[in-house]
């Protein structure tokens, strides 16, 4: 669907057929929130919602892009002029990725792009990284380069940090680049070593949107990162990944109580992510559910990134799932989605419970879908 829409938008805008189509998935993080930029551990899986870029070469040094999902908004940028903010927010991601590829000598001399996707915006499912990885892969292929997935992820993260203004970690870009069908990935965000963790065949991943959109290009998200860096400096460690709970509790005197809570979330969330990978590999959904519940409480009370609507949605899901699995907020916070991991034979009952028991602040029902774990970036 997205491939056909992207190709059609390309033909309308540029009057020719695209040379290639590239897709990159969104993702859902099962556990490990705000640990990536602390050099910690995360456990996401790529999902069957994606962004597709239809791409073709140009020889005029310009990058022209059109977004099928924004009423055909377009952008025109001189690739040799250095990054400059665009009129449209989505185009900053496109320009940012192109700029870092140009600096790395991996971009073509000019390109035409048409973009279509179905990763819900502002949902915590990483529509931004999906776009970045699809654009980066498409431009590199047009330029005759096959980028290693890890490097592609690092370049895309750099684009978002430097040109969009969100000081995100590497998780979203890594899972979009390296996702494996049927698996979650335990990612060590310091070494970038990934462990493929099979999802139990009898488990379903349910995603429900709270109806509250978030935006992470600054503000509260970046504040959390600064607080984590303050805590790391207090304890004289390179990152909070290097801190254990005993040291945290013994050495917290003199640290701002808010910063101490932020650090406690990261330290305990790292431990939960590692334990969750083992529970998932063993097919132990009840243990996974306990870890997800603890993660949500930590995000609510220590990291303070949930909102009342998300807390309500998670409570509805947890009540419907019971001890058979779990649910938690997923994504950077301040709105977005909840994720549930449940026995497949309970998926319909959980979806029905959400439909009957939750309403967004505007009175609308939650958007709910059962997703499957897919592979990372590829030709569409």
Please report, for each region that a protein language model flagged, where it lies by residue.
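Gly/Ser-rich oxyanion-binding loop with an adjacent helix/lid
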Residues: 1-22, 27-32, 38-41, 79-81, ...
